[in-house]
Amino acid sequence: DKDIKPYAEEVITKIKKSKCLLEINLEGQEGITLRTLEALFFNKKLITNNIKIKEYDFYNENNIYVINDKNISNETLIEIKTFLKLKKQKINDEILKKYTFEFWLKKVLNN
């Protein structure tokens, strides 16, 4: 059927139209996810519950908002509105390069 788009194509179309992406990690999940990489490489803001994301070299509070509460309060909603109005900061290309598939593949093959 020609009306059915491949999953990736549909996701990419939605990401391009979005100002910000939302990532909710499961309890115990650590590390960065595909959603984080999508935000980085499509130059989108990210709202996440991944507290450890602050430890990564690409973290910038203008670009990534970390939800600390399990229950979102009115204060959190105000903070998110403020975050969405902040100007997104460009991430250095050398930092981004470290999160490409090619870089990871070379790193794995060289170890």
Language model features by range: what are they?
Residues D1-F42, I51-K52, Y56-N62, I67-F103:
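Donor nucleotide-activated moiety binding/catalytic core segment of transferases
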Residues N110-N111:
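Non-catalytic N-terminal targeting/anchoring module and adjacent flexible stem/linker
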